[in-house]
């Protein structure tokens, strides 16, 4: 790739290091490369694409790639921001999944996907029933099956009383299981990484992006496919009756056919449904010069974009290199606007004033549930029934006033109610 001049004696340089089937081939590859792209994504497998000139017909003859070949590219920048600087983006390990040739001019494109060397992870259909397990136990067994190291970045493991894998590839089954509980999953450099989206949303931004840093941006806001609430059912362990709970509010309701194991399980599934669906509510795409601190699953802050300012989750980072340029396209989903951050801080201050020491009163605000209030004061939503029993008369009478038959064991509470926090 062509070197670009810089304002000191040392030039800015960008180039690739490519290890192909365990052999460093950059010296052989560099005269032919025309462009390279790398996509780092939350919901999809990472991908790479290399476009090459095949004027000597080496790629279509002697160097013909094969599907399943292993590539490990890295992007290297030298003297990019200051003299003597060297930055490296390790893209990971990829398998060649397709390649093509075209003429004229003679050219070759090689595409790779991040996956284990054993392709049966995504292709072979398996059937198995899991009982009295956890998400971590299931993930660990599947990871070991393909020689992957499991990285489980979830603060609390999730119990699974029973789940069935019915003629599904292991990758599809595990992805569906993780999505059910609001977990992300990704294969990267022979590691199977599982993380909690909620925990990642709570991380501090790694970078503040202002308009001067951006060469192009687009913003989109939609309610299509987004929800204010979700209904999830589970079997009451005392009488086996089906109990349906509401997470959120009823304005735009999603009703899932997924069955939960308990109330806590139903709450987590409902919260996960809303969190995943509402990631598309407010989105933004930016084109910026390379920032090595940006990667999928990190958070950034937008500042100077007016009402669009706020905290955003990085959904995808696309690196595009050619002889003339190196740009990054970054896809973001809004976690919270700056105005919403202020509302949350105000709400937290009100909660502290009303008795954040688990002794006193708390005034219900829009969006609250007994579960969320219990989690705030006690650290666990399972204490919600203690709150219900202490405030039962108030909760039931208020539900009747609002036209309900009853409160559904405390599922319906209303803004302005003053609850005793025992």
Which residue ranges define each predicted feature?
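Surface-exposed cap/loop segments at beta↔alpha junctions
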Residues: 58-149
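Short beta-strand-centered interaction patches in the first periplasmic/extracellular domains
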Residues: 2, 107-118, 150-218, 410-411, ...
């Amino acid at each position: 790739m062509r070197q670009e001049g810089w304002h000191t004696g040392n030039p800015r340089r960008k180039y690739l290091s490519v290890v192909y089937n365990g052999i460093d081939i950059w010296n052989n590859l560099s005269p032919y490369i025309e462009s390279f792209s790398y996509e780092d994504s939350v919901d999809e497998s990472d991908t790479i694409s290399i476009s090459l000139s095949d004027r000597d017909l080496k790629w279509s003859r002697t160097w013909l790639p094969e599907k399943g070949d292993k590539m490990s590219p890295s992007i290297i920048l030298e003297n990019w921001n200051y003299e003597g600087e060297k930055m490296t983006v390790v893209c990971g390990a990829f398998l060649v999944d397709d390649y093509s040739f075209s003429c004229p001019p003679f050219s070759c494109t090689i595409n790779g996907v991040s996956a284990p060397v054993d392709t049966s992870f995504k292709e072979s259909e398996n059937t198995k029933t899991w009982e009295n397990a956890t998400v971590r136990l299931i993930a660990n067994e599947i990871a070991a099956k393909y020689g992957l190291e499991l990285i489980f970045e979830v603060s609390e493991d999730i119990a699974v009383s029973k789940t069935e894998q019915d003629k599904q590839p292991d990758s599809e089954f595990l992805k569906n299981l993780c999505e059910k509980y609001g977990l992300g999953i990704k294969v990267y450099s022979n590691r199977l990484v599982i993380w909690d989206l909620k925990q990642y949303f709570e991380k501090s931004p790694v970078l503040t992006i202002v308009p001067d840093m951006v060469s192009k941006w687009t913003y989109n806001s939609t309610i299509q496919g987004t929800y204010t609430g979700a209904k999830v059912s589970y079997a009451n362990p005392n009488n086996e009756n089906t109990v349906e709970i509401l997470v959120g509010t009823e304005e735009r309701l999603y009703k899932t056919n997924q069955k939960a194991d308990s109330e806590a399980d139903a709450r987590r599934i409902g919260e996960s449904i809303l969190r995943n669906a509402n990631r598309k509510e407010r989105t933004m795409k930016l084109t910026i010069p390379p920032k090595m601190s940006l990667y999928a699953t990190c958070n950034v802050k937008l500042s100077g974009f007016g009402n669009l300012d706020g905290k955003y989750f990085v959904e995808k980072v696309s690196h595009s290199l050619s002889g003339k340029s190196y740009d990054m396209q970054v896809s973001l989903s809004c976690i919270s606007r700056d105005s919403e951050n202020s509302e949350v801080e105000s709400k937290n201050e009100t909660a502290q004033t009303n008795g954040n020491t688990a002794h006193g009163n708390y005034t219900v605000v829009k969006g609250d549930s007994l579960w969320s209030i219990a989690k705030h004061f006690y650290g666990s939503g399972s204490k919600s029934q203690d709150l219900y029993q202490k405030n039962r008369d108030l909760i039931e009478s208020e539900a009747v006033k609002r036209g309900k038959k009853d409160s559904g064991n405390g599922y319906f509470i209303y803004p302005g109610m003053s609850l005793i926090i025992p």
